[in-house]
Amino acid sequence: MMKRRIFSAVLLSAAMLAPAALQASAMAATASSAKSANVSTKASSVKSKASASQKTKVLDNGYPFAQVPFTSVKIAQNTFWGARLKAAREVTVPLAFSKCESEHRYKNFEMAAYTLQHPGHAGLDTKEWDVSKFMGFSFDDTDVYKTIEGASYILQTYPDKKMKAYIDSVLNVVGAAQEPDGYLYTARTINPKHPHGWSGATRWSKVEVLSHELYNLGHMVDAACAHYQATGSRKFLDIAKRYADCVIREVGPKAGQHRVVPGHQIAEMALARLYTLTGEKKYLNEAKYFLDARGTTSIHDAYSQSDKPILKQSEAWGHAVRAGYMYAGIADVAALTRDSDYIKTIDRIWNNIVSKKYYLTGGVGARHAGEAFGVDYELPNMTAYNETCAAIAQVYLNERMFLLHGDSKYIDCLERTLYNGVISGMSMDGGRFFYPNPLSSDGKYKFNADGTTTRQPWFGCACCPSNLSRFIPSLPGYLYGVKDKDIYVNLFAGNTSTIQVMGKEVVLEETTEYPWNGDIKILVKKSGVKGANLLVRIPGWVRNQVVPSDLYKYSDAEQPAYSVSVNGKVVEGDLAANKGYLPVKNIKKGDVIRIHFDMPVRTVVANGKVADDRGKVAVERGPLVYCAEAVDNDGAPILRSVVAKNPAFSVIDGYSISNTESQGAPAFSVKAIQTDAQVLDQAADGMVSVKNQKLTLIPYYAWNHRGANQMNVWFYQDLQVLEK
C-alpha cells in the first residue's frame, strides 16, 4: 500500500501541480531559455533524439585502475545488496521525488520561472515572495538534482517509461528557471530584491561561505551527466553546461572575474566528470582552478578547508562532507592532470583520517558543531556526528584512492564504511533516515536532525536522504576494478557481471551470502581474453587488521583462515607483494573459483589515545560492527553493561527484527550474537545492583528500527571501572 501511494504521487506531472500562471510561465520560460542559448525547442528535440543513438564518447578518466561500471554488474535479487537496491528503487527515490513536490522544491523553480517572465512583478514586494520565508536553505535545489541522478542510475538498469517521462516533466520546470546567460539558482532568481538570506546581494558575493551557488552547480552537473548517460537526451546536460559555462565566464583568476572558490565543495568532482563526458577541457581547467585557488582568496576558513592552499594541507579538518568531496575532487583532477603533488596531498590526508579520525563504523566527523572533524583521536560515541553524507564522501574518496594506487587497504576502508557508516543512515525499507550516526544512545538525547531520536522520512535540510537516493543505485559499480588483464574482486555480493578486459568480455557469476558467511563462488561463464587474471581481495579483517593503522586492533586470539581454489586446486600467493590481493591466474570459461573466509566473532580495542574507548571493547563479525540495543535485552541498561575479559560468543541465525518505525514494513532477519555480560542496574530507590545478562547484539546498521532506546557499540570489560 505504501509503495503504491508513493508511486502515485511520483507519477504526477510537475506542471500539473503548478498554478495556471506559473505553469504557463514555465512553458514560456523554457522556450525563452532555449532561444537565449541559440537553440530552438524543435532543434533541441531533434538533437536529443539523435544523441540517443550517437552518444558522446566518454574520455578516459586518467586513473591507472578502472572501475567496472554499475551498468555491467547485475546484483542478484533476494540478497543483502539486492534488497537494498530494491528499497532504493521502489521506496527511497520515489519518496524523494514526492518530497520534492510536497516540500516546495519544484515550486522554487516554478516561481523563478515566473519572475524571469515577469521581471519586477508586484509579488516581489510581498512576504509570499520573500525567499527566506519559504525556502529552508539556499541549496534546496540540489534535492531535485540528486534525486534525478539516482533515478537516472535506476533507469540504466531498470528502464521505466513512466519515471523517464516524469523526470522529463521536472526538467521542463528546471530549465524554465534558468536565466538567459545560464545562471540557475532559484534562491536568487525567484526574487532578486529579497533573495534567500544566505545568497548575498549579488552573484558569488557569498559563495565562499553560505550561498552554495557552486555546490548547486556540482550536483546539477553530476545529475545531468547521469541523465544523459541513462537516456541519451541532452535536455538536462545542456542546462547544466549553460550554467557551467556561466560560471567559467564569471569565476576564475582572470581580470574582471570573481576570484572565489566553492564554500561547499563538489563542483570539482562534477566538472572533472563533465570534462570526461564532453572532452571540453575548460571544465577540467575550472575544477583545477577551484582547487589551486583554495586558501589564496579573501576567505581563510578551516571550516571549508580554505585556511591554506591544498598542497600545504596534511590534516582532515573542518566540515567533514565538504572535506571528503574536496579530497575526492583532488584525486579526480590528479588523475586527469598527472599531478603528483596532488596525489601526495591526498595520501597525507587519507593517512591522517584512518590513523586518527576514523570511527570503527567507518564514519567521520566527530563534532555536531560545524559537522566537523575533531582534533586527532577525538572520537566520542554518544555525541558522534558521523553524518551519512560524510560516510558517502568517504566511499567516494576510498574508491578513488584504489583507482590511483591499486591497494586493497582502500577497499578495506570502503567496505567498513559501506556496511556500517552508510547503510545505518537508511532504514531497511528505504523510507527513513539518519543524518548523524552515533555509536551509543541513551534513547533520550535527540541526536538526529530536526531534534529527533529515530530515523525520519525527510529533514528540513534533506541532504542525506537525497544523497542516499543517488548513491545506493550506483553501488554495484564498486564491486570490481580492472587494469590491463587483471580483474580486481573488491567487494563480495551475489551478481552476474560483464567486464571489459582488453576490449573483450569476461562474464563472471558470483554467488554468496556475504556478509553473513565467508563462502563465495565465482563461475567464469565467458572469457574472451587469454591470460586474464582474477585478483581476490583478502579483507583486512581476515588478515587481523581492523584498519590500516594503529587506531584499532583485535584483542582476541583468533586467527581467521582463508582459502582460494580453482576447480578444486588451492591457490597460493604473496599478499604483501600484491597489496592484499591473491592472484588467480589465467582464468578460462568454466573455471570455478571458491573463496572461503573464516568469520569468527572478534573483539576490538581502540588506541589508548581515544579517550571515550579506553577500557572498552567493540564486537565485530566479518565486515559488520555489532551493537547491543535495549529492546533485544529485556530493556536492560545497555550503557552500563560489562562483557568478560575473554568473552565466549554464539551466533544466532535468522534473528528477526521488526520494523515498527515504518508502517507496513516487514520484519527482516540478521545474524545476531550473544555473550554473557553483567549489567549495573539502579532501582527506583537508588539502590545499585549487579545483574547477569545474556547480552544480544545485532549489526549496527540494524539498530533503531523499533523505536528510541539505549544502544551501545563499545562495552566496558571491568565492572570496577564502570562503578567509578
PLM ranges: what are they?
Residues 1-11:
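Bacterial N-terminal signal peptides that target proteins for export
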Residues 11-20:
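Bacterial N-terminal signal peptides
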Residues 21-35:
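Sec-dependent signal peptide cleavage junction
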Residues 54-161, 165, 195-230, 265-282, ...:
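Aromatic (Trp/Tyr) and acidic
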Residues 159, 175-179, 232, 248-252, ...:
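Helix-capping and short linker residues that terminate individual alpha-solenoid repeat units
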Residues 246, 251, 258, 263-297:
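Solenoidal tandem-repeat scaffolds enriched in leucines and small polar residues
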Residues 303, 357-376:
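Flexible glycine/proline-rich, aromatic-decorated loop/lid segments
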Residues 346, 412-420, 425-523, 543-569, ...:
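C-terminal beta-rich recognition modules with glycine/proline-rich loops and embedded aromatic residues
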